[in-house]
Amino acid sequence: IRIGETGGIRVDEYLETSAKDIYAVGDAIEFPHPITGKPWLNYLANPANRQGRIVADNMVFGNTTRYEGAIGTSIAKVFDMTVASTGLPAKRLRQLGIEYAASTTHSASHAGYYPDALPLTIKLTFDPRTGHLYGAQSVGYDGVDKRIDQIALLIKRGGTVRDLAEVEHCYAPPVSSAKDPIAIAGYTANNI
């Protein structure tokens, strides 16, 4: 079984190793990062679970289901706050020599005139020429998860900062704002 440059087991798009009919998943595999195309290891449970399902399908039905890769979406609670990230942060983009622009916005978790609206910060990294999203980080007390999940989906689908402003959100003052924090982040990044 071939080992890749990162020390992980090299797999193809069906998660098959260099040995026919032998598959690998989870922390052990090396797979190209969807944004950079460079091999990387991803130590997160969500991609590993998806990989398990893909391998089960491929073992039963033949190599019919492809793995798209993972961009590293993660979240943690730090006391009362939530911090989350997806894709490539500025530090990693610098290390890789990838030109990027960044924007940081400060919004509220829901409509500011409704009680208990709490601060929510979003930082975006993106291609300064095309606006394609590279990554996002967010910190706040409420609603961080749904914002990062939406941005992660856009990144995986090749979305741009303009697409952030076009995402249709459900709106009611207790749970969101008429201009959602990711729309504000998109408008701001689009102005750079």
Question: Where do the model's predicted regions map?
Answer:
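Flexible, glycine-rich terminal cap/loop adjacent to redox cofactors
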Residues: 80-86, 95-192
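Short, catalytically relevant binding-site loops at active-site mouths
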Residues: 29-31, 73, 107-110
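FAD-site-proximal beta/loop scaffold in flavoenzymes
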Residues: 1-57, 150, 154
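Active-site-proximal substrate-binding core of FAD-dependent oxidoreductases
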Residues: 38-42, 58-87, 167-171
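Short, hydrophobic alpha-helical segments
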Residues: 56-63, 155, 189
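Short beta-strand-initiation
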Residues: 6, 71, 88, 119-121
